[in-house]
């Protein structure tokens, strides 16, 4: 506990909140161009080949974004929309690509949770 004299000398510093998705610069989503599309393995105890893309955003940042869903059509120079949201078992992946917008098509034959994967209602 500081004394009154110590508080006069230098005031308390406000706690600065640190953003979990700095590359979005306070925007809900950002547009970007894929520079590389590849797979990486998750950390223990999980095992898989997770699809990710290296994306150069309009804000100037180069980030790694996860491609959700089964199957995708993304390749180099694809224009994608990126939202925040990390992938727990992939260190360094703090963004998701939004399916069903720009060059990222929705997941094929998706019946449930369609809105999260950019799929229209089946007829």
Curated annotation (Swiss-Prot):
One of its GO terms (biological process) is translation. GO terms for cellular component: chloroplast stroma; chloroplast thylakoid; plastid; ribosome; small ribosomal subunit. One of its GO terms (molecular function) is structural constituent of ribosome. It is found in: Plastid, Chloroplast. The keyword Ubl conjugation does not apply. Expressed in all plant tissues. InterPro entries: NA-bd_OB-fold (IPR012340), Ribosomal_uS12 (IPR006032), Ribosomal_uS12_bac (IPR005679). Its main location: plastid. Coiled coil: none annotated. Keywords: Chloroplast, Plastid, Ribonucleoprotein, Ribosomal protein, RNA-binding, rRNA-binding. Belongs to the universal ribosomal protein uS12 family. NCBIfam families: rpsL_bact. PANTHER family: 30S RIBOSOMAL PROTEIN S12 FAMILY MEMBER. With S4 and S5 plays an important role in translational accuracy. Located at the interface of the 30S and 50S subunits. Part of the 30S ribosomal subunit. Exons 2 and 3 are cis-spliced, while a trans-splicing reaction is required to link exons 1 and 2. This is Small ribosomal subunit protein uS12cz/uS12cy. The gene is rps12-A.
């Amino acid at each position: 506990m500081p004394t009154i004299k110590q508080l006069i000398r230098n005031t308390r510093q406000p706690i600065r909140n640190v953003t979990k998705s700095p590359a979005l610069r306070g925007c809900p989503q950002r547009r970007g161009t894929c520079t590389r599309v590849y797979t990486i393995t998750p950390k223990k105890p999980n095992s898989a080949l997770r699809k990710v893309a290296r994306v150069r955003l309009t804000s100037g940042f180069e980030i790694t974004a996860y491609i959700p869903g089964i199957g995708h059509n993304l390749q180099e120079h694809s224009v994608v929309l990126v939202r925040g949201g990390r992938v727990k078992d992939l260190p360094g992946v703090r963004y998701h690509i939004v399916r069903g917008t720009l060059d990222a098509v929705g997941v094929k034959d998706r019946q449930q949770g369609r809105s999260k994967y950019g799929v229209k209602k089946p007829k």
